[in-house]
Design a protein with these regions (language model features):
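Metabolite-binding pocket within alpha/beta catalytic cores that recognizes anionic/polar moieties
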Residues: 23-176
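Generic non-transmembrane alpha-helical segments
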Residues: 34, 38, 183, 187-198, ...
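Non-catalytic positions within long, well-ordered alpha-helices that form the structural scaffold/packing
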Residues: 122-123, 222, 241
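Metal-dependent peptidase/peptidase-like ectodomains
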Residues: 166-204
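Active-site/ligand-binding-proximal alpha/beta "capping" segment
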Residues: 194-227
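Zn-dependent metallopeptidase/amidohydrolase metal-coordination segment
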Residues: 231-269
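His/Asp/Glu-rich mid-to-C-terminal helical/loop segments that flank catalytic regions of hydrolases
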Residues: 258-306
């Protein structure tokens, strides 16, 4: 009898996951189709702008800006500093899509919802994704206002964005070496030297939030190898990597913790520090986007970068 009950539970769970996959697939396709109808160009580069970094959008020659609330199936950001706009335009002469505002796990969204926009970007033809965030610095060599190129990450989120039925954009068990594209990291260094911009490199720790870290947590993350810590980016990067999209990530160090005399921090202070970093962030990101168009993808470009609509259908 107990065995029968377990079999029934397993069958119900499997059916639930299958139905969830189908529903999510249909939403992704519906949203992508709706946005494609609005597109007049076919950009292959996208940027996700985080806390206090939305002003980079002012550098974009906007062709069209759509509020998230007007896009079918799109979540709506609830965080101050995240205005919630999907922008088509040009930056440095390059056609791009910019997401002004992102979605966080701590807002109550599931990981499928947090990473939903990345799935849509993939369906729109995006091959390169730039992600930015505001983060707490744990490396003693960092200063407030520093830019840190993300070379790797540590995932401390309690739910994994690839949990559930596997999407055919990548393997069931994706390798995570060189998640952040080495050629783009090298390019950032070249630009920083040319522009005499102070640039750091390090490991970003992704956590759930919404509380800022305790001094003990800062020390733990630092001991584990983290250089900055924040409440975003990692889920988006994992899904983009699974889709075969090349990724460049950068953090603005907006506060410092984990040292002998940690100081209290507020969201307002984080925004203020991020705002002050706007000029150099804008300069380096503009150059990155323009020059990245001329870079070949890494030799180990992964998985399926074609848009497997028919394959999705066959698995649903």
């Amino acid at each position: 009898m107990i065995v029968v009950v377990f079999i029934v539970i397993f069958a119900v769970e499997k059916t639930f996951q299958q139905n969830l996959f189908i529903v999510m697939y249909e939403k992704i396709q519906e949203t992508a189709s709706w946005l494609k109808a609005k597109m007049v160009t076919h950009p292959t580069t996208a940027i996700i702008l985080g806390t206090g970094l939305g002003r980079l959008a002012e550098e974009i020659q906007v062709e069209q800006a759509i509020d998230y609330k007007d896009i079918p199936n799109f979540p709506v950001s609830t965080v101050e500093g995240h205005s919630g706009k999907f922008i088509f335009g040009k930056l440095g002469g390059v056609d791009i899509i910019a997401m002004k505002g992102r979605f966080h796990y701590y807002e109550g969204y599931s990981m499928k919802e947090v990473t939903f926009p990345v799935r849509v970007l993939y369906e729109l033809g995006i091959k390169t994704l730039f992600v930015s965030n505001a983060a707490g610095g744990m490396n003693p060599g960092f200063k407030i206002g520093d830019l840190m190129v993300i070379t790797d990450h540590i995932n401390f989120f309690p739910e994994h964005p690839l949990r559930g039925k596997n999407y055919p954009t990548g393997p069931r068990f994706p390798d995570m070496h060189e998640t952040y594209d080495p050629s783009l990291i090298k390019l950032a260094g070249q630009i920083a030297r040319e522009k005499k911009i102070r640039l750091q490199y390090g490991v970003y720790v992704g956590v759930q939030g919404p509380t800022f870290e305790t001094p003990a947590e800062y020390r733990m993350y630092r001991t584990l190898g983290g250089d900055t810590v924040g409440m975003s980016t990692v889920p988006e990067v994992i899904v983009a990597h699974h889709c075969g999209i090349r990724i460049f990530g950068i953090s603005v160090v907006t506060d410092l913790g984990g040292f002998d005399n940690p100081v209290e921090v507020s969201h307002e202070e984080v925004q203020e520090a991020a705002d002050k970093a706007q000029p150099i962030m804008t300069e380096i990101m503009r150059e990155m986007i323009v020059r990245s168009e001329k870079l070949e993808h890494s030799k180990n470009e992964r998985y399926n970068t074609d848009h497997p609509t028919e394959e999705w259908k066959s698995q649903s």
